[in-house]
Amino acid sequence: MARNKTNNDKNIANDEASTVLARVLPSNVQAEQMLLGAILTNNELLNYVSEFLRSEHFFEPIHQKIYNGIEVITEKGLIATPITLRSMLANDELFHEMEGAEYLAKLVTMSMMVINPIDYGKIIYDLAIKRYLINIGEEVVNDAYNSSLEFEAKEQIERAESKLYDLASEGINEKSFTKIAIPISESIASINRAMKNNDHVIGISTGLIDLDSKLFGFHNSDLVILAGRPAMGKTAFALNLALNACNNMLIKNKRDNEEVQSVGFFSLEMSSEQLTTRLLSMSAGIDSTTLRTGMINEANYNRLRKEAIALSELSFFIDDTPALTISAIRTRARRMKRKHNLGILFVDYLQLIRGVSKSDNRVNEVSEITQGLKAIAKELNIPVIALSQLSRAVELREDKRPMLSDLRESGSIEQDADIVMFIYREEYYLSRKEPAASDPKHAEKYAEWQDNMSKAHNITDIIIAKHRSGPVGNVQLFYDSQYSKFVNLETKYPVHPR
């Protein structure tokens, strides 16, 4: 009985699929003919539709060739007429099959009935989008039936969602020229906000005063690269920045009566539990080893619970899915922007992201990833902070302070980033250079080493190596490794370690 029902369901599904495939794709050949004829009669009309209409939007192949020919001719500063088009398409096989010269004359004749050519352009565009939508639907169905595909169902859904979003955005959200008065008004508003703020931070505050004085906060549409060698504290620093940003956005949103903005954190390496343990450690002031082992007294536990409740109420979202593609990250970020008003995005880390296109060249793949991250920042109008590894070349030289050339697969990373920051802890490298006891000058060298260690103790350098809209330079922070916490170094600031 159950088997018969299953077979019936399959038969119904197959019949429905056959019906869908048998349908004629939506098109309006007459609208295409009338628009092309109107443009051939008056080339100025091309300016009104070329902003959203492309040759591939036409259904008939001959119309695609004619529209493309008109664009090529007019771009050269010439006039597109049946005569100039006939000369251009003289060797085209399809043009000859359609008796092109007579067909062009027919189009011009039909244009006499055109009242508003822009309306015809919109009809052609709308029908093309519907055909693309049908193609996406067929791809989704075929992929779902194909069990040999390497993609899991969830990833197929994300791929479909990404294609649908791209289709929805096509031609509609494309930017064109904007009268200068609009961006000037936005700039003045931004300057006014900065004047009202005592700290003159016009972006999302990092919560670290000296760093804010260099960056002026994190800015919408910026791609920020935070790079460092292993054990420098990249993830810990990113978590500090994310938590500070979350708290500072909440304060601003409440003050200005705005919708609460969220922090998104993609963790491709560590689990969400590992990240939240670190967040609890830095918030409660209890080292993470104590938290993991459970060796905690009642007073600390009560403080921990209080901080856990406070953190739980924040609009802070973690996605710890490993090996995400840049396309999946874009899809999930879009979804979060829509559902939770995403205000800033962190990605840990860049080298663990997979490109969409299959490429044996890692440099090209990283270029695709960094361009994708920058596109997310611009599209969603948020800062994107991406962590990055540095090459081993750092370890091979005496001076371990990072440089732009140390970025792994560095060309595109440096080019696409608005800000490149390096995190560097001299103490880490000094601790591995303790003078050997067998050295004849051990006492002298040991005293010098101890002095250097004392100066570098708990100090982290944030090296701003590239800043598209501001100064570069070095900022020193106090790093409490016990609690994975970064705070202002100077005692003159409200939050400091002394």
UniProtKB/Swiss-Prot annotation:
Q: Which GO terms fall under molecular function for this chain's record? A: ATP binding; ATP hydrolysis activity; DNA binding; DNA helicase activity
Supply the EC number(s).
Answer: 5.6.2.3
One Pfam assignment = DnaB_C
InterPro entries for this protein: DNA_heli_DnaB-like_N_sf (IPR036185), DNA_helicase_DnaB (IPR007692), DNA_helicase_DnaB-like_C (IPR007694), DNA_helicase_DnaB-like_N (IPR007693), DNA_helicase_N/primase_C (IPR016136), P-loop_NTPase (IPR027417)
Top-level taxon in the UniProt lineage: Bacteria
Which GO terms are recorded in the biological process aspect for this UniProt protein?
A: DNA replication, synthesis of primer
What are the entry keywords? ATP-binding, DNA replication, DNA-binding, Helicase, Hydrolase, Isomerase, Nucleotide-binding, Primosome
What do the Gene Ontology cellular component annotations say? Answer: cytosol; primosome complex
Catalytic activity of the protein:
Couples ATP hydrolysis with the unwinding of duplex DNA at the replication fork by translocating in the 5'-3' direction. This creates two antiparallel DNA single strands (ssDNA). The leading ssDNA polymer is the template for DNA polymerase III holoenzyme which synthesizes a continuous strand; ATP + H2O = ADP + phosphate + H(+)
Q: Domain (SF4 helicase): give its ranges.
A: 197-493
Binding positions for ATP? G228, R229, P230, A231, M232, G233, K234, T235
Which Gene3D superfamilies does the annotation name? Answer: DNAb Helicase, Chain A, P-loop containing nucleotide triphosphate hydrolases
Which protein family is named in the record?
Answer: Belongs to the helicase family. DnaB subfamily.
Q: What does this protein do?
A: The main replicative DNA helicase, it participates in initiation and elongation during chromosome replication. Travels ahead of the DNA replisome, separating dsDNA into templates for DNA synthesis. A processive ATP-dependent 5'-3' DNA helicase it has DNA-dependent ATPase activity.
Q: Quaternary structure per UniProt? A: Homohexamer.
Q: What is this protein called?
A: Replicative DNA helicase DnaB
The record lists the organism as: Rickettsia bellii (strain RML369-C)
Instruction: Tell me the lineage of the source organism.
Output: Bacteria, Pseudomonadati, Pseudomonadota, Alphaproteobacteria, Rickettsiales
